[in-house]
């Protein structure tokens, strides 16, 4: 059996940064939980972080990321790069099956176990199985509306939850 993913979306607009996720945990073809919290604030409330993938793996990565963030004096880019380097080279970490989406007031990054640290071109980023749908909806709303970051993030993940069977409509929202 395989753990299935989720959807986490981050939207930036004006001075607002919003991260939202669904709450579904799926194992094989069974929904185990519908209200999991997959986004949280860290770094004294200055960073938003969300995960897709194995919960235990993501918790380990959250802890390591927060340690790197503190080690590098609140430098989000340096913390993300250093975590990605460790993740790629450490034998134990390499086996972790998760992705992180992290953001502060200045940057948004997707961090993967293959050593990737990706800064999205637009003001929206997403990870997980519903990402393509959320990104498409979010980009359209960013381009053609004056909605707030929170409204765009919420609508983007709602649309993803209507299409992706591994994404439900029980959302957790964090905002900077």
From Swiss-Prot:
The record's listing under CDD domains reads: protease_HslV
InterPro entries this protein is in? ATP-dep_Prtase_HsIV_su, Ntn_hydrolases_N, Proteasome_sua/b, Proteasome_suB-type
* Gene Ontology cellular component annotations, sorted alphabetically: HslUV protease complex; proteasome core complex
For whether the record's keyword set contains Transmembrane helix, the answer is no
Domain of life assignment: Bacteria
Please tell me the species this chain comes from: Thermosipho africanus (strain TCF52B)
Similarity field: Belongs to the peptidase T1B family. HslV subfamily.
| Stated role | Protease subunit of a proteasome-like degradation complex believed to be a general protein degrading machinery.
**Would the keyword Metal-binding turn up in this protein's UniProt record?**
yes
Location in the cell reads: Cytoplasm
Q: How is its activity regulated?
A: Allosterically activated by HslU binding.
* Subunit and interaction comment: A double ring-shaped homohexamer of HslV is capped on each side by a ring-shaped HslU homohexamer. The assembly of the HslU/HslV complex is dependent on binding of ATP.
Gene Ontology terms: biological process: proteolysis involved in protein catabolic process
Q: Which UniProt keywords apply?
A: Allosteric enzyme, Cytoplasm, Hydrolase, Metal-binding, Protease, Sodium, Stress response, Threonine protease
Q: Which residues cross the membrane?
A: none
Q: Which residues bind Na(+)?
A: 161, 164, 167
Q: Which residues form a coiled coil?
A: none
Please state the Enzyme Commission number of this protein.
Answer: 3.4.25.2
Entry protein name = ATP-dependent protease subunit HslV
Q: Per the annotation, which location comes first and is thus the protein's main one?
A: cytoplasm
Q: What does UniProt list as catalytic? A: 6
> Which reaction is this enzyme known to catalyze?
ATP-dependent cleavage of peptide bonds with broad specificity
Query: EC top class, in one word?
Result: hydrolase
Tell me one GO molecular function of this protein: metal ion binding
């Amino acid at each position: 059996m395989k753990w299935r993913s989720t959807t986490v979306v981050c939207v930036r607009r004006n001075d607002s940064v919003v991260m939202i996720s669904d709450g579904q945990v799926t194992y094989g073809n069974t929904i185990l939980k519908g209200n999991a919290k997959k986004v949280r604030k860290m770094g004294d409330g200055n960073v938003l972080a969300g995960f897709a993938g194995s919960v235990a793996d993501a918790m380990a990565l959250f802890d390591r990321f927060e340690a790197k963030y503190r080690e590098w004096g609140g430098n989000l880019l340096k913390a993300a790069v250093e975590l990605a380097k460790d993740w790629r080279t450490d034998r134990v970490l390499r086996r972790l099956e998760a992705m992180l989406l992290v953001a502060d007031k200045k940057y948004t990054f997707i961090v993967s176990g293959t050593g990737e640290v990706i800064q999205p071109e637009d003001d929206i980023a997403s990870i997980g199985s519903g990402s393509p749908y959320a990104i498409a909806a979010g980009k359209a709303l960013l381009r053609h509306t004056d909605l707030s970051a929170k409204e765009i993030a919420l609508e983007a993940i709602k649309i993803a939850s209507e299409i992706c069977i591994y994404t439900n409509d029980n959302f957790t929202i964090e905002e900077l």
